[in-house]
Amino acid sequence: LLYSAYVETSFLKLIHTPKAFTESEIIQIMAERNLEQKWLKCVDLAFNKLNTTNLGEVANKKQTLHRLLQEYIIDPSQIRNKVAHGQWVYCLNNECTKVNHDTTALMANLDFVKIEKYFCIYDKFHQCILDLLISHRTHYRDYY
C-alpha cells in the first residue's frame, strides 16, 4: 500500500513540476480514465518534447519505459487495489466471479526485497521521465 501511495503522490509532483508540462497538458493527463492511462499520456507527452530525428531510438526508449510502467507501477497498483478491497489471501478477477491465480501468486510472493526493488526501479523510472521533461538535450546521459 505504501509503495502505491508513494508512486501516486510522486506522479502528481512530476506532472506539476515547474516547466515540465503546460497547464493544458496537465489537464490532458488528468482527464485520462485511470492511473495506467494517465502514466501513458505523461510518457507520450514527455517524448513529444524531445527535439530528435532518431525516431527508432525514441520508439525503443518509449517501449522500454512502457514495459517498466506496466511491471513496476501498474501491476503493483492492481495488487494494492486487491488488498484495499480485502482480498488478502485470494485475489478475485474484476467481476469477482472466480479467483485470479496470477494476481494471487504475485501477492503471495511479495516480500521486503521485491518491494525495495520496486522503490529503486520506480525512482529511476521517475528520474527518466523528469529528465525527458527538464533536460531535453542531456536526458539520455544518466540512464540510457
What are these regions (language model features)?
Residues L1-P18:
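Short, hydrophobic, well-ordered secondary-structure elements
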Residues L1-S4, E36, H66-I73, F112-I115, ...:
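Amphipathic, non-membrane alpha-helical segments in soluble helical-bundle scaffolds
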Residues V7-E8, N81-A84, H126, L130:
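Structural signal for well-ordered, non-membrane alpha-helices
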Residues F11, K19-K82, G86-N93, T97-H101:
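Flexible secondary-structure boundary motifs
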Residues E71-Y72, Q87-Y144:
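Polyanionic, low-complexity intrinsically disordered segments
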